[in-house]
Regions:
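Short structured motifs
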Residues: 50-55, 112-118, 140-142
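Catalytic strand-loop segment that frames the active site of acyl-thioester-processing enzymes
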Residues: 50-81
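Short hydrophobic alpha-helical segments enriched in small aliphatic residues
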Residues: 5, 9, 18-20
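Hot-dog-fold acyl-thioester-processing enzymes
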Residues: 75-94
Length: 189
């Protein structure tokens, strides 16, 4: 008796693979050599590697970053789902780093706070997509030009499973301000 692998009972739970560019229904900007090197650096950096997360894509202009967080022996908790600390740790650094890269060296950017809402246990590989558009950069510059010393911006990212169901939502508050010009000393005059 021959069984086909398509009808095999172990294959019944397999979900079809959907390419990330199709899943998010957006055209993907090509990675540059520099952004690819940063992706590799993130993936090999011990603090990020310890979360179990993997950066899968960084746009050349840092307007988009994508990550995945698989369920494996490093991310599995006592009840067999993805550990909540791994979920948060995998998404923690990206909005701050993206804003630092997009705004440039004349700005100071810090994470100020974070809130995590767990909606469903992560029972498989989770993905997250971070975006910081040009309109967001204009809004930040405009807020700082109106006389405000600093501005707090709130960003939200969702960790989704393979079927697109949201397992956790992370809300990050990021502090941004312009660097002040160094004061001239009397010797400089």
């Amino acid at each position: 008796m021959t069984t086909h692998t398509k009808n095999h009972p172990c294959r019944a739970k397999a979900r079809p693979y959907i390419h990330p560019a199709i899943r998010y229904n957006k055209r993907r900007m090509a990675e540059s050599f520099r952004s690819r090197m940063m992706r590799w650096a993130f993936n090999f950096f011990p603090a990020f590697r310890g979360t179990g997360g993997r950066v899968t894509y960084i746009a050349e202009d840092w307007s988009e970053v994508r990550i995945r967080l698989p369920l494996n022996w490093r991310t599995r908790n006592y009840v067999g789902t993805i550990y909540g600390g791994s979920m948060y740790g995998a998404v923690d650094p990206f909005y701050m780093v993206m804003l630092i890269r997009r705004l440039g060296p004349e700005y100071i950017v810090w994470d100020k706070s974070a809130t995590v809402r767990f909606q469903k246990p992560g029972r498989g590989t989770l993905t997250a997509r971070f975006t910081v558009g040009d309109e967001e950069l204009r809004a930040i510059a405009q807020a700082l030009e109106t006389g405000a010393r600093s501005v707090d911006r709130t960003y939200q990212v969702e960790l989704k499973d393979e079927t697109g169901v949201v397992c956790a939502t992370v809300e990050k508050v990021v502090y941004i301000r312009r660097k002040e010009a160094p004061e001239k000393s009397l010797r400089d005059e």
